[in-house]
Amino acid sequence: MNPTGLYPESLCPIARSLDLLGQKWSLMIVREAVAGATRFADFRAIGIPSDILTKRLTSLVDAGVMERRPYREAGERARDDYHLTPAGMALLPVLSALVEWGTEYLPIPAGRTLENVTTDTHEAVHVAYVNDAGEVINQDRVTIQTVPAA
């Protein structure tokens, strides 16, 4: 049974997104970029092996999630910074939803964790469904269905 009616899987936006973002480390790179990381060494600092980081950054750039910007420090060779594109920044709600889900269903007993907050007041915020009229819709009223592609 295929409740969404999508054949083949390549037509499903979830499957297509996971082809890129489901690779180990990809969303962690985006998380670090949202937090301000731009340089290879910044991303490498979270424990990603260099060869894997190179592949993931290339995939994210090729997909339009990140862009390379050349820079050169005095006396150094030219290198690239990596910055989120608008498509990359549009992943913030995805990361925020994962923060909420992971905090709720995979809690850690102690230490530090992540929380979604506003940039100015650091007030806690939550991911929500909002209709075109701006009304917040309860999750039990939301489903995923097939519609004609745009």
What would you call each of these model-derived segments?
Residues 22, 73-95:
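Basic, amphipathic "hinge/linker" alpha-helix immediately C-terminal to the N-terminal HTH DNA-binding motif
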Residues 44-69:
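Canonical helix-turn-helix DNA-binding module
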Residues 96, 100-150:
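C-terminal regulatory/oligomerization modules of transcriptional regulators
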Residues 1-2, 65-72, 90, 94:
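Short, contiguous, well-ordered secondary-structure segments
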Residues 12-52:
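N-terminal helix-turn-helix DNA-binding core of bacterial DNA-binding proteins
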Residues 38-43, 57, 87, 91-95, ...:
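Extended, folded domain segments that form the structural surfaces/walls around functional sites
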Residues 1-11, 23-24:
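Recognition helices and adjacent regulatory flanks at domain boundaries
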